[in-house]
Amino acid sequence: MNNGIMATVNQSLDQETAVLITTELGHVGNPIQENEAEEKMLEGFAQEGEQIARDAIISVLGHVDHGKTSLLDYIRNSSVADKEEGGITQSIGAYQVSIEDKNLTFIDTPGHAAFSKMRARGANSTDIVVLVVAADDGVQPQTVEAINHAKAAGVQIVVAINKIDKPEADVDKIKGDLAKEELVAEDWGGDIQMVPVSAQSGEGIPELLETIFLVAEIMDLKASFEGPATGVVLESGVKRGEGAVATLLIQQGSLNTSDFILVGDQTRKIRALKDFNDKPI
């Protein structure tokens, strides 16, 4: 109160105030970075168990109005996994698509901020970026920004040339524009898979998914399901009737009810686990 801060015994203080109070009480406070405890714990984790094949994690990026959301919606609505009663909750940060007993995990969060955090912490939560470019508009500033983020994170890129149903669509022009950004189509002698699609009619989307599965298979992605869980928080908040909730992407190990998780300098106990369809695990 003397410092102009009103707080109860159950509230947290900011670091500066906590250090000031500690000093006034005759002790020495040692400030730490927000993620320091988390990083030290991760350093102490050794990967346990056999590394086995895992699902690919996909982020869909692109310039505004190039059809990213429409493409995601079409894939969601056409997949076997999403035909269950009640559909899919639109606010979640991730969901799975199942096709012929094979799965893909899509991250539906703002891609740019996610990649910045990945670079800062030295971790990739995405394996493949699907870059959406409108066939009637071409490469735009956010397209270039998305390309740079993907390259900086060392992520595989698959291009979806969208809106091929439009009269003004020019697929070859798009390939030429992308070549200037050092993304050269495979049929132009490069190594980037580019698939013409229409998020409105669904044309080309089966081929796009097949291409993603092929790229993922070549990457030979693996993880262990044993030992403590490590991963990424995609989004978090407070939900009425449930309290604090978070969408997690587990990259190694297994997470169980009653486990404790550490995020930054905060710890919480897992009270319940649900899948992307909001069903208890």
Where in the sequence are the language-model features?
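Charged, amphipathic alpha-helical linker segments immediately N-terminal to NTP-binding catalytic cores
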Residues: N3-E38
